[in-house]
Amino acid sequence: MNNFVSTNLLEQQKPIPGMDLFLKRSKSISPITEIIEEIRQGRMVVLLDDEDRENEGDLVMAAQYVTPEDINFMSKHGRGLICLTLTEERGKQLNLSPMVARNGTKMGTNFTASIEAAEGVTTGISAADRAHTIQTAVHVNARPMDIVSPGHVFPLIAQKGGVLVRAGHTEAGCDIAKLAKLDASAVICEILKDNGEMARLPDLLDFAAKHDLKVGTIADLINYRSQTESLVKRVAERLIETAYGPFQLIAYQESIANQTHLALVKGNITADKSVLVRVHEPLSVLDLLDASNKSHSWSLPDAMQMISQADAGVIVMLRRDEKSEDVIHAINSANFPANNQYTLKDYGIGAQILRDLGVVKMRLMAEPRKMPSMAGFGLQVTEFL
């Protein structure tokens, strides 16, 4: 986190819009190492997600340490939905099923059926009952028979790879607990204002100061993990000749889905220059055949042609298992644009490939959209094309 502010700016007579908030934020955000230590000590923190995502803050603490007093604090002061973040492995251990067959939420939050401890609770809603349910679910030897559904605790299943794949509080809760060398589970609760509206950055900083809680960001957590971890690895590369000139073709192996993604690179990528970037997802065989396909904002041929005319550029092609029915559907609906809604998983994997290629500033060949937690990967979008 860069806390430096030019003294020349501070000495100007006219107030700078947003400067007070910037200074307050810089002083209020704790290093992620301090946030991890707070979690390790069983204390609660406020964790902020990206302003380009949900733009919210959650109370977060390690699930194994939760007490009735903690649940009561979240209920009284946080006011949001109290949830239990779990890894996919823990969800399988408890035999948790998805809340719905098709997740239609904007952020794809992975709710399971709500749960209750099978024994040791009364109505299930009291702070003591919910704390007991959580402790039951995260016990190292927890069994499916130890919980029942429905209940008053709402489990969320984190995606494999954590915040390097999905920049959400669900993944952040599990990641921070794991980094603190605790059970990889957390209790989280959104923070609302007194009037019931979502608390935003200024409100969240005031809230944390009032309750003496440390504040961290998911972007800093992403940055912390990405310093030593990556979910993609270069496995092959060579120079190829295309109809648009020579490109360096690089293959990346993704460890989560065991997919091989491709990158086409032209020229020298440097951190100080804003380079053309196209992230193409999902890559279909039809993208290489049908020049009239309008399911993407940029076709592969158009993107390659534009980059061929520039000094440098990158095309990242993210592959997914393309089943027979997918190909048939694509042929039948070729004239209809796709919804163009990237998943957060695609952002995370694509961002790690771009980071490996040395991209920092990019002129993104895509329709303008919010780009969650790109700062955590050290990436900056300077322009949409």
What is the predicted function of each stretch?
Residues 1-385:
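Catalytic domains of riboflavin
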